[in-house]
């Protein structure tokens, strides 16, 4: 993702940082995510309604093998966090293993997500939300079906002078990521107008956080302390570095290979 660094810096200078990456995963894995989303246990779904919004959500991924592996083997991995830090210039990024507000989402035909800005604090982790990302997973999505992720300069329902900054179509295997800023960015999803035989605008969401805590003055930072603090710490062997592929615990190769 380092090749997206210039796009990130350019959009940050315009008001808020964002990037779009097409063909993010291999198609087979992305299709498995979609099929899994369609067949996820009905009892795990919730519906979010507010100010005209209507969105279905599923965040208990432990029973869904593909989403669980993609989340924890790729999106929450140290390698991927490093790639995010290199692209964004933000250090100390942390994933949310509990997936508060994250996981699968569906907007059905005729629904919208009204203009808003996101929650900024994860009370369970005691961390501030810094990045929001989505991977769109409905195959063969057409731009004329709507469901675009739209960003404005202000909330258009409150400010008639608000202008559209960006409108991104939810095309299959497209990954979008943006930086959360104070009271922004204001965004929403345009009306979904897909055929009735299309399941809906499906995505899987991942959020990333940072800590703003400072060291405890009564217990300042220190290394592991021994009787003697003389030590050595060096590599035992010279070997090839990681090749850039994310491999699951079962040996699955998910095909994502960051470009340097």
Predicted regions and their residues:
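Non-heme Fe(II)/2-oxoglutarate
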Residues: 2-88
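A structural signal for short, well-ordered beta-strand segments and their strand-loop junctions
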Residues: 20-21, 47, 94-97, 103, ...
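A structural signal for well-ordered alpha-helical scaffolds and beta->alpha junctions
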Residues: 26, 30, 68, 77-81, ...
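Non-heme Fe(II) oxygenase catalytic core, chiefly the N-lobe of the double-stranded beta-helix
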Residues: 38, 74-128, 140, 144
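Short amphipathic alpha-helical segments embedded in low-complexity Lys/Glu-rich regions
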Residues: 51-55, 101-103, 194
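Short, flexible beta-strand-to-coil junctions
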Residues: 52, 137-140
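Catalytic core of Fe(II)/2-oxoglutarate
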Residues: 110-111, 118-129, 139-260
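Eukaryotic charged/polar low-complexity linker/IDR segments
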Residues: 132-136
């Amino acid at each position: 993702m380092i090749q997206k660094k210039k796009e990130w810096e350019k959009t940050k200078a315009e008001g808020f940082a964002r990037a779009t990456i097409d063909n993010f995963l291999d198609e087979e894995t992305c299709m498995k995510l979609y099929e899994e989303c369609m067949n996820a246990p009905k009892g795990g779904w919730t519906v979010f309604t507010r100010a005209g919004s209507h969105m279905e959500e599923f965040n208990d991924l432990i029973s869904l093998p593909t989403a669980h592996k993609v989340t924890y083997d790729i999106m929450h991995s140290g390698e991927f966090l490093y790639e995010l830090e290199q692209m964004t210039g933000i250090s100390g990024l942390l994933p949310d293993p509990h997936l508060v507000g994250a996981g699968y989402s569906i907007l059905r035909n005729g629904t919208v997500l009204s203009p808003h800005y996101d929650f900024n604090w994860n009370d369970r982790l005691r961390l501030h939300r810094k990045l929001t990302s989505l991977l769109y997973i409905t195959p063969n999505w057409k731009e004329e079906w709507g469901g675009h992720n739209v960003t404005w300069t202000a909330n258009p329902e409150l400010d008639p002078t608000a202008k559209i900054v960006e409108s991104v179509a939810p095309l299959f295997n497209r990954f979008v990521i943006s930086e959360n800023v104070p009271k922004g960015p204001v965004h929403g999803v345009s009306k979904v107008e897909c055929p009735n035989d299309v399941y809906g605008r499906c995505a899987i969401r991942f959020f990333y956080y940072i800590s703003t805590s400072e060291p405890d003055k009564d217990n300042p930072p220190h290394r592991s302390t021994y009787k003697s603090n003389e030590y050595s710490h060096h590599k035992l062997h010279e070997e090839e570095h990681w090749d850039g592929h994310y491999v699951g615990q079962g040996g699955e190769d998910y095909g994502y290979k960051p470009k340097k």
